[in-house]
Amino acid sequence: MGRAEREAFLAEPRVAVLSVVSEGDRPPSTLPTWYAYEPGGTLTVVTRQGRRKSRLIRRAGVLSLSVQRPEVPYRYVTVEGTVVRQEPATEADLRRIGARYLPAADLDGWVAWEAGGQNANGTPEVVEVRPDRWLTGDFS
């Protein structure tokens, strides 16, 4: 895929798989995640402050994120990038990501739930990543 095509593919609302180096002799931590991306910009994910994924990302300072189209013809885009921001998520951060995945009627309630600290998994944290390397596949 060329630059414009891979960036457009990544900008579509897909569930991504995020990988970050783990501790000790454990394999990389690999988890599904929501994300936001606009062509030419940075990649943004939300995690939880103090949780394992957040700690690993902070320690490593880099991560990989992969999205795919599971139907024939298969396609995928993987981004390897450097963390440029990791801090408490604002309502604007939550809204930007949530709007990609939730029906409009549910977005305000979800943002209020997350921003209000009602998620038992912890306080939302935004991680912003600068894409450094792109890997793509197109089996059409």
Residue ranges and their predicted role:
Residues 13-49, 57, 63-67, 76-78:
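Short beta-strand segments
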Residues 7-8, 35, 55, 117-119:
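Short secondary-structure boundary/capping segments
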Residues 50, 61-64, 107-114:
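Short acidic (Asp/Glu) patches
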Residues 75-140:
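Charged, gly/pro-rich active-site loop segments
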Residues 51-53, 72:
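Short, surface-exposed beta-strand-loop junctions and turns on beta-sheet-rich folds
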Residues 24-27, 70-73, 117-121:
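A short beta-turn/loop motif at secondary-structure boundaries
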Residues 1-15, 73:
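Extreme N-terminal tail/first-helix region
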Residues 10-11, 58-59, 98:
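Alpha-helix boundary recognition
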